[in-house]
A protein has these predicted regions:
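Extended, well-ordered protein cores
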Residues: 1-258
Length: 258
């Protein structure tokens, strides 16, 4: 039996409901457009996922069920995307473009995620700011996101890098690091490039500028895993998955320790 990828798509299936499959049945257009939608959904949802705190939860309108933590954030972000929360075109809700992303703010996120005094979400403003910064990146990189400045055009760029329909996962990962390095809070940098989820440790020895640095890139790796299924559904075979690591966080660390 094939074990599913550790990707955001598993959270969209919480409660025994495959929300993506249900949405996909309503889609019109070719496989590439479907893949663009999946890429946008994965990226925005992953970037909105962080510790929600013990008191927050999301009541799903369709089912009436309440979900908390990562599962709740997944369902809430799925609904936000589906309703056109990242689209600048009311006639085309299933898209994430630079203009809508750039103006995304905490009030819109609070409304979409049902945040009230009795249902507080940790890091609300920071999450919204991260999405807005993605809009700036999408606008500034037509080489990755096309002249139309749409987040989903990252699919077209990645598919164009495949050779004979085959794409190494390391190329997906490197593209994500290149594309989104400006959005991360800067602790460490090399020649003005923010390194993101990279930390110092004296045991990490190297003979170049990475001396003393340990890369984790948890969210970027999770994004890479989460883009595999959209690409493969569109006919791009992703290979060399073992080149990535397990996500460096407490649950996976505990699993490896066990």
């Amino acid at each position: 039996r094939r074990v599913p990828f550790h990707a955001r798509w598993r959270h969209f299936e919480v409660g025994g409901r495959d929300r993506w499959a249900a949405l996909a049945k309503t889609l019109k257009g070719d496989a590439a457009e479907r893949a663009r939608i999946r890429v946008e959904l994965a990226i925005t949802s992953v970037l909105l996922d962080a510790g929600a705190g013990p008191d927050w939860g999301y009541r799903e309108p369709d089912s009436g069920e309440r979900y908390a933590r990562s599962e709740g954030l997944a369902v809430a972000s799925f609904d936000l995307y589906r309703r056109g929360g990242f689209s600048n075109d009311p006639a085309k809700p299933l898209r994430a473009d630079a203009e809508a992303l750039k103006r995304f703010g905490a009030p819109a996120l609070a409304m979409a995620f049902q945040v009230f005094p009795h249902n507080p979400l940790i890091g609300l403003a920071g999450r919204a700011a991260l999405i807005a910064s993605v809009g700036g990146v999408v606008a500034a990189r037509p080489d990755l996101f096309g002249a139309g400045a749409r987040l989903g055009h990252l699919f077209d760029h990645l598919a164009g890098q495949a050779k004979d329909g085959v794409l190494p996962v390391t190329l997906i990962f490197a593209t994500l690091l290149d594309a989104f390095s400006p959005i991360w809070p800067s602790r460490l940098d090399i020649e003005g490039v923010a390194l993101g989820d990279v930390w110092k440790h004296p045991a990490a020895r190297a003979k170049d500028r990475t001396d003393g640095l340990v890369p984790f890139h948890k969210l970027s790796q999770w994004l890479a895993y989460s883009l595999v299924e959209p690409l493969e559904e569109a006919g791009v075979r992703v290979v060399d998955l073992d080149a990535l690591t397990g996500l460096p966080e407490y649950r996976n660390g505990g699993l490896l320790s066990d």
